[in-house]
Amino acid sequence: DTWEKEGKIVPLRGFCSSQNEEIPKQYDEVKMYSAWNVAQSNPCFEIWLYYHFYENKPVDEEMQTFVSFKEYVSSTISGGFDFQRDPVRLEDAIVNTRNNFSQDADGKPTLYSSEVYVLGEEIDKFVKNDLAKLRNKLG
């Protein structure tokens, strides 16, 4: 739980927090370019993985027994997310993530929301046929 920074050992959470302070500024700068898209997730990227399997937002009471959302996702997806097998669930993830998406007054994703479904929609255009073949193969 420590990280080397400028020759000093600091708590990892503190290091990550200090690195993340610039994210809102960088987000606003990137959004100025119409050819670029930024996809944020709250609380983390794993909410996108979660929506590959689940239609509804996580239940807060279940979350309280876990240290992190990543740990929660690992425990709720039997065997964890399999990057070889589970991409066939892309269309489910897009629908589930879109249906559960909401923003706050500043336009930032609220808890258990992700904008990654927008990227998923773009990827799906290119892999739709391959995913259909893989789904048929997996039965």
Q: Which residue stretches match the model-derived regions?
A:
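C-terminal accessory helical subdomains adjacent to catalytic cores in phosphodiester-
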Residues: 2-139
